[in-house]
Each structure stands twice: as structure tokens, then as C-alpha cells.
Design a protein with these regions (language model features):
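A short, conserved structural fragment
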Residues: 95-103
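Positively charged, polyanion-binding regions of nucleic-acid-associated proteins
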Residues: 43-64
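Short, cationic-aromatic polyanion-contact patches
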Residues: 105-123
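Short cysteine-rich clusters marking metal-coordination/redox-active sites
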Residues: 8-11, 31
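Short acidic, hydrophobic short linear motifs in intrinsically disordered regions
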Residues: 62-73
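Short helix-coil junctions and helix-kink-helix linkers
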Residues: 71-83
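Short functional micro-motifs and their immediate structural scaffolds
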Residues: 16, 36, 40
Length: 123
């Protein structure tokens, strides 16, 4: 029986079963050692998720936001280092079914989104 893919708790990317996890697949939570070291999302990650959802709540149901808007909401003066954490937060929200990632007006899989993205509520 094939093993279904998992979603990394840290970065929100999907990952597939690997032979090295054969004995412990039920307990694997992270896609890589780097994500394992970073651990489960903390307070800042939750603030970013909340900022994304709050920004979308403030707009029309069909509106989109740029990830940089969420980063600026959390840290107005030093938002650039938060861009990758915002993308991670967005991927986790997609995994929860609370968000869609859009490029060029089309929904994209979080694992395949490269370059500029927009975030919106599911339709």
C-alpha cells in the first residue's frame, strides 16, 4: 500500500515517504532536518498566520493580498526577513484549507509556487 504524502509542520510543504523513514513513518512530522531543527511554528509564525487572515477579513471576499502586506503588518520597519516565514505560514494555511495561493490568477500548489504570489480565501 503506498504511503500518502505528509505536510511538514514547520514549512507547510508536502513530502513523500522515504525508505529511511520506513520504521517511523507514523511519527515523521518534518520534511527535512532544517525544518526539524526549527520545530513547530511558534508565536511569530502564528502572528503571521493571523495577519494574513486579518488582512483578508478586512477586504472583499474575492480580494487577494500580497505576502509582503502580512510581513509589514507584523513588522513595519523590518519586514523583508519575514517574507519566507510568511510564505511558510501561507502554505500551512493552505494545508488547513483556509487559504489559496494564486499566481497569474490561477491557483497553484504551494510546493510549486515560485516567484510572486497572491493569497486569497478559498472560493
Amino acid at each position: 500500500m503506498p504511503h500518502p504524502p505528509r505536510i511538514c509542520l514547520a514549512c507547510g510543504r508536502s513530502f513523500a515517504w522515504r525508505k529511511k523513514w520506513e520504521r517511523d513513518w507514523e511519527n515523521v512530522k518534518y520534511c527535512s532536518n532544517a525544518c526539524k531543527r526549527s520545530g513547530e511554528p511558534g508565536a511569530e509564525a502564528r502572528r503571521l498566520e493571523r495577519a494574513i487572515l486579518d488582512l483578508l477579513d478586512e477586504r472583499a471576499r474575492t480580494a487577494t493580498i500580497c505576502p509582503s502586506e502580512a510581513a509589514r503588518r507584523v513588522s513595519p520597519d523590518d519586514w523583508r526577513p519575514l517574507m519566507e516565514p510568511v510564505r511558510r505560514a501561507a502554505r500551512r494555511l493552505v494545508a488547513d484549507g483556509r487559504l489559496e495561493i494564486v499566481q497569474g490568477g490561477r491557483i497553484v500548489e504551494p510546493d510549486h509556487a515560485r516567484g510572486p504570489i497572491r493569497l486569497r480565501r478559498p472560493r
